[in-house]
């Protein structure tokens, strides 16, 4: 029999130390990885609940196991809240991740060997949008589009590629693009060749939910997303769509049993909590601040002489091109890490470096905004980044910036 008094610390001190060290790292470091955020204690409570014990293959009211009456309530709450939050007619909250959601949708709408048209990873896309190392580039004939010399999506190129290759699916969405996507234009292109339009809004789902970034749902046949990142929920995925009974049936069957078995009910409960939090009025204010902070940081690094791809940002992230400074993303990432500023190296368009080295940094503001940073703090942070990059190899600058970072982290704790 288990006791509620059982703890990891009392049984597995090595693991307990790793967890505590990570908690302390999150408090003492500034997090600028665009795909990371801090889940609320309520979300984490749901993920650590007894729902982790329950197997629930199937869907609410149609399970293959007994004893699902309570987890049915949790999943239905998540479904209903997701539909309300995004203005969707259909929601599947079972995908274990964004990639799993994409896999289910792709298998629902495509056959192996079909042509897909997605954004190149090198130009800001995602692995699951047709990268050769991913299932999407192995099972399907992937054609890739990119951005132009101004850092904007080249819609004329997409139309040309669509006309030439006649894809079965056009994919919108990105992992490192800082401008607003014209969903209506992508819909028009897809319609011109009789293709499905699928949008992966994993990075901007929170912005879309709050109405500070255009929603793809009115335009796409299916919309996928993660539930963490800007949504601040648990790690997981979701599929959304407008009313279409035929497609809904395909999506349902391709999530379960097509690509997954039992759903993670503790994670689904965490999604339900996160969607409720996102329906609160202050969530819109949070997302507006996320964008304001990203713009403030981008402006300052440009003022300090750094190149920002596309010249600015209209969402939660921007991409610094370090090529003119003769710096690599790998070296910049490491130097900033020593100053307790966590970023990620990232390829830039036409990057001469390998993906393990890169010529860029991706900067995102969801996590610092959760801490309470506003434009003033974001601007100071941009200055600290530039100070370190301007003085690569000077560890005294790294040490000074680390002290500043530790001080501001104490002023803005994650979990106060």
Curated annotation (Swiss-Prot):
It comes from Halorhodospira halophila (strain DSM 244 / SL1) (Ectothiorhodospira halophila (strain DSM 244 / SL1)). HAMAP family: SHMT. This is Serine hydroxymethyltransferase. It is an enzyme of class 2 (transferase). InterPro entries: PyrdxlP-dep_Trfase, PyrdxlP-dep_Trfase_major, PyrdxlP-dep_Trfase_small, Ser_HO-MeTrfase, Ser_HO-MeTrfase-like, Ser_HO-MeTrfase_PLP_BS, SHMT-like_dom. Catalyzes the reversible interconversion of serine and glycine with tetrahydrofolate (THF) serving as the one-carbon carrier. This reaction serves as the major source of one-carbon groups required for the biosynthesis of purines, thymidylate, methionine, and other important biomolecules. Also exhibits THF-independent aldolase activity toward beta-hydroxyamino acids, producing glycine and aldehydes, via a retro-aldol mechanism. Pathway: One-carbon metabolism; tetrahydrofolate interconversion; Amino-acid biosynthesis; glycine biosynthesis; glycine from L-serine: step 1/1. It holds the Pfam family SHMT. The modification N6-(pyridoxal phosphate)lysine is found at residue 229. The keyword Amino-acid biosynthesis applies. One of its GO terms (cellular component) is cytosol. Belongs to the SHMT family. Its EC number is 2.1.2.1. PANTHER family: SERINE HYDROXYMETHYLTRANSFERASE (PTHR11680:SF50). Keywords: Amino-acid biosynthesis, Cytoplasm, One-carbon metabolism, Pyridoxal phosphate, Transferase.
